């Protein structure tokens, strides 16, 4: 899980979602997981 100021899709399988007011990226590749902090 990377915590970044700006999250964006890295590949086509990345999906931007909102959980508890936080923007997150979920992907089949675990290295692409990101959270906005």
From Swiss-Prot:
GO terms for cellular component: chloroplast; ribonucleoprotein complex; ribosome. Keywords: Chloroplast, Plastid, Ribonucleoprotein, Ribosomal protein. It holds the Pfam family Ribosomal_L36. Transmembrane segments: none annotated. It is found in: Plastid, Chloroplast. InterPro entries: Ribosomal_bL36, Ribosomal_bL36_sp. It comes from the Eukaryota. GO terms for molecular function: structural constituent of ribosome. Belongs to the bacterial ribosomal protein bL36 family. This is Large ribosomal subunit protein bL36c. It comes from Cycas taitungensis.
């Amino acid at each position: 899980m990377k915590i970044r100021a700006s999250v964006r899709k890295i590949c086509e399988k990345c999906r931007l979602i909102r959980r508890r007011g936080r923007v997150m990226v979920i992907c089949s590749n675990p290295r692409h997981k990101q959270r906005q902090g």
